[in-house]
Amino acid sequence: MFERNQKTIFVLDHTRYFSIASEEYISMDFLKGKPSADGGATGAAGNATGSGGSQFSKSLWTCACESSIEYCRVVWDLFPGKKHVRFIVSDTAAHIVNTWRPSTQNMAHVMNAMLIVGVPSRNVPTSSDYSVIHGLRAAIEALAEPTDEQLAAMADFGTDELPRIPNKGRVICITSARDNTSMKSLEDIFNTVLVQQNTLAAPPSKKGLVIDHCHLVILNIVPLGVESLVTNRSLLKISPLLDVEIHTVSAPDISYKLTHLILNHYDLASTTVTNIPMKEEQNANSSANYDVEILHSRRAHSITCGPDFSLPTSIKQGATYETVTLKWCTPRGCGSADLQPCLGQFLVTPVDVTSRPSSCLINFLLNGRSVLLEMPRKTGSKATSHMLSARGGEIFVHSLCITRSCMDEAPSITDGPGGRVSDYRTAELGQLIKMSRVVPLKVKDPSAPPLTRRLPRYFPLTTSSSILFHLQRHISWLPHFLHLLVKEDMDKQDEVRCQQHIHELYKSASRGDVLPFTHTNGARLKLSKAKDQYRLLYRELEQLIQLNATTMHHKNLLESLQSLRAAYGDAPLKSEPGASLLRTYTESPLSPERLEPISSVGASGSSSSNSLLKASKRRMSSCGQRSLLDIISSAERSQSNKRLDFSGRLCTPLGQVAKLYPDFGTKDKDTVTTGASITPNVKEESVRS
């Protein structure tokens, strides 16, 4: 409740130095040819000044007052009655401008008090009595004073429980120091006074509240174009009670600096509404697009932006902070039927309240109109992310729901990331959940199987991704067969039944019966031949039995199925018991003939495919007994045997290095040897190479 930004105190340096000009000159033009009461004196003056123009510059004091008052205006607009700002003017003494009372926490009171204070006089002699230290001492005393909220919290506790009330604050001191040594002196004095104040507030005296923590921000102001010897410094912890940061800024840029600071002090965000159509002030028949910058809570952007959206940001000229750029959209009436589903609403205040575009936008919203703001996505399209509207004389920004709203219907399970999937096994999943319920027992049963064995090991989510579970709707005995396969306590009778069903599948495959598929749009059902369908069926059935092979009966079924696959040409024989089972099938008078492997269309294609299949089987059987290094080495040896080796390596004895071009460079041999004697050597070398 009592955060550090609840109390903010501005300490303004009112010494003689702040009476000098900021060196930022503003041009001023007079209207020409207008008659005045003094017989045209104004017109003459206008002609005189109109040719050359006139300029003036604000003082350092004016720049400090304007920017600090704008700071408190933003705070009071966005947090009315919740956040408090005080002003203290320091020269020969500390002058209190306002208090924590709500009656003095308004713009009218502060501006009237600043008008009475006035600009520092240049005629005042330089004296050590003029110092900003008086204001810093008064600021620490003001932090120890309770606000109305703290007084209400203190009323709920006894007198012995006053230290339980949190008391934190921030002091923003606008001054001008010569160098870092002077700035260090200010920090030490402030820290010393802070410790002394907490000593006075501690029992038994209890003069005010104990200050838990203070954040001191020192703004060192210099005229435009003047270099300062004070260096900038980020937030530094001086003591457990005090954090200090220092900023050196020119007088014309102090407003941008305070706007940047207020974003972090109150967790605010800046939004620039672009492409606002407005009539030209000088030409009412034409219009131009303007931009208006507004401030609001940072949550207005954070709760809207998702992973598929990005906030377009930019940096305003002269500023150092980022602003989110949103585009003006078609205005709508602020009726109940036009309100969009929103995630939150937050108060809004313009940065430059006196500019013409800001006043036009404010009046437009206060007249009962609403404005939609567009935010571009990463893909390039735009989305309406925010809306500006006014109610009760206050302007709000609404964060619209750009994703699926909570008021919409729940998304259909068929609208998954892979497209429309309509064959989910929803009913089977519900039965599986009921069968997999776990109930705690008072006494642990040591003979009970572990939980991992009882969990399902194979469950296709869709019907089209499975052959077994797709056919159970069309083959009457298949559901009971699948139920027997996953039983934990399979007995001999269940094994015999499963053997009969497997034998029935084998007879259907031998007759060439097509499996009763209703559709073949699954990835595994694209093959239309009966043999291929049965081969896929056997593979999935073997996978299901392997995952549930917890008893000897399951293992017997697995061996018999592997023997069937071997007879079908899909897998080699695994063991001797499987071969015996295969012989019992084939030697029976009712058993079908042994199925041949799949062949291509045409006589020539069948012979080539059979040879390739046999060769691949031989390679796979041989690869199972060799390592990967042996396979690669044999492949390299087979390639190297196709070409002759280098002649130098063949002629050189083992263990020695072959010399390349041994006759190269011997001039005597080249001159003595005739061309006839060289020719056989060349031929011999060419033959060797």
Swiss-Prot record:
Location, primary (coarse class): nucleus
Gene responsible for this protein: Asun
Source organism superkingdom: Eukaryota
Modification after translation: Phosphorylated.
Subunit relationships: Belongs to the multiprotein complex Integrator, at least composed of IntS1, IntS2, IntS3, IntS4, omd/IntS5, IntS6, defl/IntS7, IntS8, IntS9, IntS10, IntS11, IntS12, asun/IntS13, IntS14 and IntS15. The core complex associates with protein phosphatase 2A subunits mts/PP2A and Pp2A-29B, to form the Integrator-PP2A (INTAC) complex.
Signal peptide interval: none
GO biological process: cell division; centrosome localization; dorsal appendage formation; flagellated sperm motility; meiotic cell cycle; oocyte nucleus localization involved in oocyte dorsal/ventral axis specification; posterior mRNA localization involved in anterior/posterior axis specification; regulation of fertilization
Name used for this protein in its record: Protein asunder
Organism field: Drosophila melanogaster (Fruit fly)
Subcellular location(s) per record: Nucleus; Cytoplasm; Cytoplasm, Perinuclear region
Family: Belongs to the Integrator subunit 13 family.
InterPro entries: Cell_cycle_regulator_Mat89Bb (IPR019355)
Coiled-coil residue spans: 521-550
Pfam families: Mat89Bb
Tissue: Expressed in nurse cells at stages 9-10 of oogenesis and exported to the oocyte. Also expressed in the follicle cells surrounding the oocyte.
Disruption phenotype: Results in almost complete steril males. Mature sperm formed in small amounts in testes are immotile or weakly motile; seminal vesicles are largely empty. Primary spermatocytes appeared normal (Cysts of 16 cells); however, spermatids show irregularities in nuclear size and number. Spermatocytes I exhibit failure of nucleus-centrosome coupling that normally occur upon meiotic phase entry; those that progress through meiotic divisions exhibit defects in spindle assembly and chromosome segregation.
GO cellular component, one term: INTAC complex
Segments for region (Disordered): 592-619, 665-689
Motif Nuclear localization signal (NLS): chain residues: 613-619
Keywords for this protein: Cell cycle, Cell division, Coiled coil, Cytoplasm, Developmental protein, Differentiation, Meiosis, Mitosis, Nucleus, Phosphoprotein, Spermatogenesis
Main function: Component of the integrator complex, a multiprotein complex that terminates RNA polymerase II (Pol II) transcription in the promoter-proximal region of genes. The integrator complex provides a quality checkpoint during transcription elongation by driving premature transcription termination of transcripts that are unfavorably configured for transcriptional elongation: the complex terminates transcription by (1) catalyzing dephosphorylation of the C-terminal domain (CTD) of Pol II subunit Polr2A/Rbp1 and Spt5, and (2) degrading the exiting nascent RNA transcript via endonuclease activity.
Compositional bias of kind Low complexity: 599-614
